[in-house]
């Protein structure tokens, strides 16, 4: 079942062809949901956009289009407003028919795409021997939500964790541990991730001030690269310990990922450099092998190259990212690749993509996209830090969110004189706390910085996870109070006699349109905005329309609207990685 916007678009493009010739059939009709109900449900300003090309006044173009629009089963007669806006109001009979189809459809009328794409989403990507911090939160949950939406649409999605598991820092850390804590490299449980972070800081300080230690660390890098057994064993232990800690975070956040770290691409790095040399793209600059690119300059206005092999013969992030991109396009056969990293890496990926383009590695139809995001800030507007000035550990942040949710819940339970089990309190605290953290991030336009506030994200009012969860809980409460099993309700034609009933019905039908937007523009905040508006509309409906006390057939009609709203909220929240609750 196509969403209303998709059906309107198809009819509109047929009218464009009928009005101005078949060459106009692919023109974007510029249809958008109306921002004010007095203008109907959807609007188009395509007449204004075509005026210059067609050499006609916009209003005349609009009149011609309206004459050729076949919409009797879908909309009221279109209205032309102002200089040439075309306004559309959906027919009540159309809304009723669409709702009836949704009642028995587990996917709420959203059909899988055809044909599906093979998509890779590269996200999270923490560094081995370092703790995940608040900066990893954004990549992890934005990437997860994008992957969930694409998977629901029917695409074949490979979720990749490009962990930082290679580099000179390992030589430094292994040398330090061999010297100071040799038992840590032979006993898997001898240290945890916090120990590794502390040891890394000590090793770095030692490296910066001790030339002898520098030489030892560099030798360990050589040992590691050559596959020397002791060095490889130590490296593997460090990786395994870090993975266990990462997995604890992923399990808490319900994140699925396939690890394919930087080291995976090591065998492919020499060929990257050799192929770029063969193609005549490499230029030697101060001993390094570089590709000079169009549009990239340093602060002095000089050309800024992408270095793919250092002067000492070593490789870097750019070499690895080029190898990863070529592998994903070749062996993985990806048609769309999405990189979810902070906006500070935008130039890096733009350079990598341009090199791949010039080397001829990008198929014409391939979509390669960097999905940047801004900083998480404290309430002082600065980068979020602990009171001691350190980076906030992700596990500490999640713990505090759950603790605060637990405190809020126990306070509310006491005020309501309810009695709840410890198991209930813990389950709700986990769902609300973690859901609030995810939603607070995803509800922001990812391109912007946002201020992290526990008080705001855990509030029961406003655009928050608790507000949306409570709308779902309220619907389950209606079912419990009335002794109703929504699944057993007989499908009936909806009675849309009240304005809020019609608004709610229309919004339920728009989920597919919103998911198309998210999949196209990779902006999960649009799904959040939709779910928030749906919750607001439901609460208005709940306040204004009797449900359990209504007469039939209105009672069943309103119960079915409640059920469709709950199912839409549950599905939408699941695509954000948030679980619903029966009670709060």
From Swiss-Prot:
Listed under GO cellular component are: cytoplasm
Q: What is this protein called?
A: Arginine--tRNA ligase
Quaternary structure (record): Monomer.
Q: Which UniProt keywords apply?
A: Aminoacyl-tRNA synthetase, ATP-binding, Cytoplasm, Ligase, Nucleotide-binding, Protein biosynthesis
Where does the source fall among the domains of life? Bacteria
**Native source species:** Synechococcus sp. (strain ATCC 27144 / PCC 6301 / SAUG 1402/1)
What is the gene name? argS
User: To which protein family does this belong?
Assistant: Belongs to the class-I aminoacyl-tRNA synthetase family.
Where in the cell does this protein reside? Cytoplasm
The UniProt entry, under CDD domains, shows: Anticodon_Ia_Arg, ArgRS_core
Whether Oxidoreductase counts among this entry's keywords is: no
